Structures are given as C-alpha cells and as structure tokens.
C-alpha cells in the first residue's frame, strides 16, 4: 500500500515538475559599511519553486488557496525519501500555512519512534512569500495588497524567531525585504502603486506559498525533455551591477562577453552616426553655426539667436523601433544615474538603422561605463512602463528630466562679434524659419495633447528665504565686496521683519493681478499656465520623502501677538467668545453627522489653575465661618467651532511657531477636541483623517502649562484615537518633549528619528529642539 502511494506521488510530482524550474539560489542579506546588499547565495538544504504555471488562473481567491494547501502540503523524509502528508503527522510542525521548510524524519525512520524536524535556512524571498501568503489568508490588507513596512515587515518581525531562528536582526533588514519585492516584480510580486496612487503596496502574482523540493529528488528523462521544449521563467533573481558567484561554464561566459563587446561596438557606431548626421545638418544650414553638447547629453542644436532644435521632439522613422524585442518592458529614456538607466541596453539597431536622417533614442548614447553601475532598488515603487504607442509621451518625459540643466555655450571673442552681427542681419531669419518649419513638419500628432509646461519661475518660499539669508550671513566678506549681495541681504531682512510685525509685503505680481481683475475679471483667467499664489498664502517645499501635513496650516502673514478685531466688544474679548448659542448641535461638513454640543463635561478634575482659584476665594472669606464655596464650573470638552479659531491660532503662535492657521480644521470638526473652562480655551487637539488610506495624523495637541497634570491630554488623545477606529494613528513629537512617555502608554511606537523636522517652521534664532520622532499606533 505504501509503495503504491509512493509511486503515484512520484508520478504526480514528475508531472508538476514539467511546469516549474528548479532553483537553488536565493537572496541573502549582507552589510557593507552600513548598506544592505542583496547577495545571490546557494542553499544546500533545500530549494524553492517560485515559478508557477502561467497558463492557468492566478488563484487570487483565498478559498482556492486553502484547498490547494490541504492537497499539496506534505513533508519529505530524508531517510526513506517519502512525502508524508501533513494530515498524517502526529503533531503540527508549523502554525504558518504553506510552511514545510523543515529537515524532517518520520516516526518509522527515527530511532526513538518520534517525528524529528529541524528548521531549514530560509532565503529572504521564501520568508517574504510565506508572510504575504499568510497575510492574504487572514483577510487583511486592501484588495489583496499589503503595505511593505507596516504589514509585511511587521509580520516577519513578529515571527522572526520561528522563521529565521537565531539569525542576527540588522538595523536595515527591512531594506532587504524591499529589495526582494522590487527585484521579484513583476514576476512574483505585483505593486499597487498604479491602483492606489501611492507606493508601498504589494501582493503575490500567484497567491501560493513557495514550494520546497529536496535537492536529492531527480527528474525523469521524459520530464527533462518536456522542460527543455517549454520556455520557463528564470527564478534566479539578478540585479544589474550585483556580483554573482561563478556558477556557469566557460562557454556561456565567453558568449556573454562577446555579446557585451558587440553592444559596446554598436554604441560606438551610433555615436559615429550621430556625428555624421550633425555634419549633414551643418552643411544644409550653410551660414548657421551649430554647437554640439558634450557626449552623454541630448544632441540639441543651438542657433545664434537662441533657437534650439531638440532632437527629442522629432518623430522617429519606421526603421527605428520604439519597443524593445528583448524581455525588457520598454526603452530606457531616463537620465543617467536614475534607477531605470542601469538596466542593460538591448541590441536594437541593424545596418538600415544607422542612416543618419533620424537620431536614435538617447538611451543608446550613454557610455558603457554608465550602463554597468550598481542596481538601485526602490523599496516601494514598481517600474510601470508607459504605453507602447505613446512615443511623444516618452520623449516629453525625457525633456522634463533634462529641463533644469544648463546648456553649455561658448563665449565668442570680441573680434568675432562684428562678423556675427553682420551674419545675423542677413541669414538668421531664413534659417530660423527653415528649422521651425522642419520641426513643425516632423512633430508627432500626439504632442498636441501634452500638458502645458509649468511656469518658468516660481516664488521663493519662506523657508528658502531663511536658508538664503543664513548663507549670506555666513559669508560676510563676500557680501561686503558685492553691492548686489548686500542689497539682497537687506531685502531679506526687511521681509523677515515685516512678517514678524504682521505687515504686508510688496508683491508686484499680486498688484498687477489686482489691477487687471479690477479692470476686467476675465483678464486674470486668460493666462491659465501661470497661476499665482493668493494673498496670504505661502509655498512650503519639503526636502524629505514624506509629505508634510503641517505645511497645510502655514500662512505667509502671521498675525501679531495680541491682535484682535477692533469691532469686538471688550466683554467678549474678556470672556473669549461672542457666540451665545453654544449649546446647539452642529452638522459636520465632512461626515454629515450631527455633533452634540459637548463631548464630555468634567466636574471632578481640578487642575492647578482651579486649585489656585479656589484658594483665592476661600482666602477672601476666611473670617466668615458660615461661608461655603459654590459649585465649580466644569471643564467642557467640545468640537471646534469658528469662534474658537482666533484664540487657538494665537495659542499656536505662542507655544509652537508663527504662521499657524487652523481654519481648515473646521472642514472636519469630528476629529477635533477643544477644552473650555467657561469660555476660556485651555487645551485643544486636532487630527487629519485623510492622510492616507487606513492612516490618520494628529497634527496639533496642546494643553496650557497652567492646566497640565490633570489628565486633560490623556482624554483628548483617547477621544481622537476613538474617532478613527481601524486606522493607524501617526504623529510627530519633538525629541525634547516629555509627552513622548504619554504617547508610549497608548501604544505608540517609534518608527523614525527625523533630523531638522521643525527647522522650516521655527525662527532662525529659536533655541527649541528641531528634531522629531515619528510615532505610529498600529491597529
């Protein structure tokens, strides 16, 4: 009975092996000077089958995967060379689904009659696939996708000891996980960047776990013939620029070296054709001098009058292929040094393609040294090739990449200037019109649909003004010798002083726009490409990858400290509000829910300020034995209202930094809490609910120093967390803020230490700590 089962099992495995490729290589983690590298290392214990049958369905349903696992999961005995189904084992070896990576000895072969097993050394790709498969069975994630760091890395860290044993956990092990995802895309892993519009989401292409096959299991001759006739996917993951151990024969190495040399010679032929094309164009434009840019740049032609003929705008002929015949998804039109430019350039040209009437793609002009750099791994974004037919879109993106660079021009001597002026008067107009007609004739039809270019000049942000002033102050000698630098420094100082005093700044564009709008309203809307900033609005650019949520609350003209409207009565200025109907419910514009007037009314809490007030009252009536203190007013927790904003802004400018305006929080009052004593605001907290999918961000949380140590901040954090059930809550806290301990009590964990996070907000003379911790509360 056992022999028949064993024979049928071997036959079924041989049939399955016809559709998969064996591999004994996996990704391992290594560190060189603090950087995590991906090393291709052979595994002696076991190999993983990562290539599934491409002809069938992708099996994205969890139910189908569970049934597949119940049929396929078995353990291989090293001694009797049999596969033992998981249902026949006496005990469960792994609590993870699809995990059979053990050196197993069945009870019949063991000396003591007990099953023996030992964890095999897993590769990083096996670990990542096991983690993603088990996450998919749990039903979490978003449409089958999981976040790279928050889900996949968290799962691996939770089961680190069980999966990886006593392997050392380095400080950058998560970057190895990111490398596995990027390198394995799109064969084994699929990115959700295109579906969700943000990087970091990944899923398995085939929702199956990796399959272990012992090294000693041999294939039948018929199976090998089928495998040789059927094209299979190469499961060996290679990154251009990473070293591989010599595992191929000398013949294959020699063939690869010959192919590489042919590509190098081909690139030289292309550059030679480029020079010949330049000579032909030079002869056709007899009196128009042409200047070429250095090798490695796009071959633009610069005319004397500044007219630039950009070869990237010319349409390619039918002889120049726009799609690569190799497995590469598309041509490389990116600039040298970008991750996409490190891929190997395929052989694209034949003898007919070397005709110099049309320039070949710019990716072929790079030197061979540039193409053999180390592969750069993007931890969260998958390369998505553009549509095959949109040639103008590719060329347009190329132009955008090269736009900021300066074009090298030669300076003519004084003797050549008169001759050039004479030549300009006779020949320039005809030459420019000739080249303009030629370029318009060769324009592709899809270029009309391209988006208009942005403005050439953009206003300098407040933070950039601060950095510029700091650089000028660091070079007093150079500034003293240059009148222009002294004038610029004085302008920056005056602008900064006006902002500190709340005075308006002169903006010529704003004045001209106001005059045009005053004459005719349609004048301001004619120029759709140059949209200017509105009055009182600043531009804050961030240098870090994460989007600064705090930037949306910044204004260019902070109000003066103590500023109030002149029409406000003194009584309302004293009590803090002129809204008499405070006990009425409001409707949230964000969720359309009816919000009650109060979240909570606390009669028990006695902050230090209230204790001092009660002592003052009792001291006044200390000689009256019949005096009894009256009931104290409660602390009212309520949602933000428009009348709260001026006081909250002034408190933010006093305790945080200038220029904060929280008027935007009125759009989502559900995610706010304001604490009042009678009509005096003593604390507040705000949360942004729409930072990312499944993530909210606490932007501001403040308790007045005289009202602290009474549990007010604890209740505010609890309330904000409860308003976003099921979402992660994130925040930034200053490195010197003792509230870090309070956040840790709620379960917030430190994810990142951000240097100079508050540098763009604090004034230059501020002594506050400008570094911050980024905390996250996972749900």
Swiss-Prot record:
Keyword Translocase among UniProt keywords: no
GO CC entries: ATAC complex; cytoplasm; mitotic spindle; nucleus
Residue intervals of the N-acetyltransferase domain: 635-779
Coiled coil: none
Superkingdom of source: Eukaryota
Swiss-Prot/TrEMBL keywords: Acetylation, Cytoplasm, Nucleus, Phosphoprotein
Basic and acidic residues biased stretches: 255-275, 402-423, 443-452
Transmembrane feature ranges: none
Gene3D superfamilies: 3.40.630.30, 3.90.980.20
The UniProt record lists the keyword Acetylation: yes
Pfam name, any one: Acetyltransf_1
Comp. bias intervals (Low complexity): 314-334
Cysteines engaged in disulfide bonds, as pairs: none
Residues annotated with N6-acetyllysine modification: 230, 291
Subcellular location: Nucleus; Cytoplasm
GO molecular function, one term: histone acetyltransferase activity
Principal location: nucleus
Region (Disordered): 1-34, 247-292, 314-345, 360-457
Subunit composition and interactions: Interacts with the LIM 1 domain of CSRP2. Component of the ADA2A-containing complex (ATAC), composed of CSRP2BP, KAT2A, TADA2L, TADA3L, ZZ3, MBIP, WDR5, YEATS2, CCDC101 and DR1. In the complex, it probably interacts directly with KAT2A, MBIP and WDR5.
Function: Component of the ATAC complex, a complex with histone acetyltransferase activity on histones H3 and H4. May function as a scaffold for the ATAC complex to promote ATAC complex stability. Has also weak histone acetyltransferase activity toward histone H4. Required for the normal progression through G1 and G2/M phases of the cell cycle.
Name the UniProt record assigns to this protein: Cysteine-rich protein 2-binding protein
Species annotation: Mus musculus (Mouse)
The gene coding this protein: Kat14
């Amino acid at each position: 009975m056992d022999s028949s089962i064993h024979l049928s099992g071997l036959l079924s495995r041989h049939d399955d092996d016809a559709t998969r490729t064996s591999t004994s290589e996996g990704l391992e983690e290594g560190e060189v000077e603090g950087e995590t590298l991906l090393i291709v290392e052979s595994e002696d214990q076991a190999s993983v089958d990562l290539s599934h049958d491409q002809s069938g369905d992708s099996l994205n349903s969890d139910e189908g995967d569970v049934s597949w696992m119940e049929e396929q999961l078995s353990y291989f005995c090293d001694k009797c060379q049999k596969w033992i189904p998981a249902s026949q084992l006496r005990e469960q070896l792994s609590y993870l689904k699809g995990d059979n990576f053990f050196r197993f000895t069945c009870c019949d072969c063991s000396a003591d009659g007990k099953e023996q097993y030992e964890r095999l050394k897993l590769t990083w790709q096996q670990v990542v696939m096991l983690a993603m498969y088990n996450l998919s069975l749990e039903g979490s994630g978003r449409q089958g996708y999981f976040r790279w760091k928050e889900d996949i890395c968290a799962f691996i860290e939770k089961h680190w000891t069980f999966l990886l044993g006593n392997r050392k956990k380095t400080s950058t092990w998560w970057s190895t996980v990111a490398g596995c995802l990027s390198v394995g895309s799109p064969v084994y892993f699929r990115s959700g960047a295109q579906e969700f519009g943000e990087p970091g989401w990944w899923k398995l292409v085939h929702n199956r776990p990796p399959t272990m096959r012992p090294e000693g299991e041999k294939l039948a001759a018929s199976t090998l013939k089928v495998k040789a006739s059927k094209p299979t996917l190469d499961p060996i993951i290679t990154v251009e620029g990473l070293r591989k151990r010599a595992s191929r024969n000398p013949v294959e190495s020699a063939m690869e070296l010959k192919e590489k040399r042919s590509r190098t010679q081909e690139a030289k032929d292309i550059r030679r054709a480029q020079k010949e094309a330049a000579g032909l164009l030079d002869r056709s434009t007899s009196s128009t001098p042409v200047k070429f840019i250095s090798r490695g740049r796009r071959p633009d032609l610069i005319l004397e009058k500044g007219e630039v003929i950009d070869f990237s705008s010319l349409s390619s002929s039918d002889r120049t292929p726009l799609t690569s015949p190799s497995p590469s998804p598309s041509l490389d039109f990116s600039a040298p040094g970008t991750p996409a430019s490190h891929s190997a350039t395929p052989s694209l040209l034949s003898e007919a393609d070397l005709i110099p009437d049309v320039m070949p793609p710019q990716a072929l002009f790079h030197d061979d040294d540039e193409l053999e750099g180390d592969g750069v791994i993007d931890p969260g974004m998958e390369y998505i090739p553009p549509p095959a037919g949109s040639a103008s879109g590719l060329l347009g993106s190329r132009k955008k990449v090269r736009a900021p660079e300066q074009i090298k021009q030669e300076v003519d001597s004084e003797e050549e200037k008169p001759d050039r002026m004479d030549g300009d008067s006779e020949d320039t107009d005809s030459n420019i019109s000739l080249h303009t007609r030629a370029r318009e004739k060769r324009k592709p039809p899809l270029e009309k649909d391209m988006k208009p270019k942005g403005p050439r000049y953009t206003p300098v942000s407040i933070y950039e003004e601060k950095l510029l002033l700091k650089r000028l102050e660091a070079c007093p000698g150079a500034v003293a010798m240059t009148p222009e630098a002294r004038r610029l420094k004085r302008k920056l100082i005056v602008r900064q002083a006006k902002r500190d005093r709340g005075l308006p700044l002169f903006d010529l564009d704003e004045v001209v726009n106001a005059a045009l709008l005053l004459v005719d309203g349609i004048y301001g809307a004619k120029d759709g490409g140059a949209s200017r900033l509105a009055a009182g609005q600043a531009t804050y650019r961030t240098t870090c990858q994460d989007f600064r949520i705090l930037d949306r609350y910044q204004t260019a003209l902070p109000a003066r400290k103590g500023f109030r409207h002149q029409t406000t009565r003194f009584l309302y200025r004293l009590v803090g509000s002129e809204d008499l109907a405070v006990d009425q419910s409001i409707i949230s514009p964000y969720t359309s829910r009816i919000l009650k007037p109060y979240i909570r009314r606390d009669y028990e809490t006695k902050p230090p300020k209230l204790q001092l007030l009660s002592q003052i009252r009792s001291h006044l009536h200390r000689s009256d034995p019949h005096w009894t203190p009256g009931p104290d007013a409660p602390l009212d927790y309520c949602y933000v209202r428009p009348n709260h904003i001026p006081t909250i802004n002034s408190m933010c400018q006093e305790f945080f930094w200038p220029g904060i305006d929280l008027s935007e929080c009125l759009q989502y009052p559900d995610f706010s809490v304001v604490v009042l004593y009678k009509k005096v605001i003593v604390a507040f907290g705000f949360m942004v609910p729409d930072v990312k999918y499944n993530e909210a961000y606490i932007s501001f949380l403040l308790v007045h120093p005289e009202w602290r140590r009474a549990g007010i901040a604890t209740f505010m954090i609890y309330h904000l967390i409860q308003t976003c059930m099921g979402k992660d809550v994130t925040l930034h806290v200053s490195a010197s803020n003792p509230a870090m301990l309070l956040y840790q009590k709620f379960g917030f964990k430190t994810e990142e230490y951000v240097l100079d996070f508050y540098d763009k907000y604090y004034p230059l003379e501020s002594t506050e700590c400008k570094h911050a911790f980024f905390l996250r509360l996972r749900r």
